[in-house]
Amino acid sequence: TLLCVAMGLGSCNNTIPTDALQGEWQLVTMGTTAVTAEAQPTLQLNIKEMKVNGSDSCNTFIGGITNITDKDLVFSELATTLMLCPETTMQVADTFGAAMKKVAKYEVNDKQLLLKDDKGTVLLTFTKK
């Protein structure tokens, strides 16, 4: 325990819910706005390899997980393809991409994944696929 405090970890009892996070997630809301099936981003988390990939509804993306604890989740800069899509799909893709850049925290409950900013505001809500 002394080592944990010295390292600034506060508590060594924090465990990452790897099994709960691992897998494919489908976006249901961005902020308070529901997304439609025609433009529905997905997120694939590989916690063991610290990788993330998915679709923003127009383009595919890939990146890394740079920090993960029992509450914190930070992604690296995401690389995306550069497809041109219908305007409404592009709006979803742009909003999703901007939200992913702000993700700092998460919560998993009842087969839902909530991605939050550093203040705890829910940015993106996913359900397990």
Model-inferred region functions:
Residues 6-9:
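Bacterial Sec-type N-terminal signal peptides, specifically the leucine/valine-rich hydrophobic h-region
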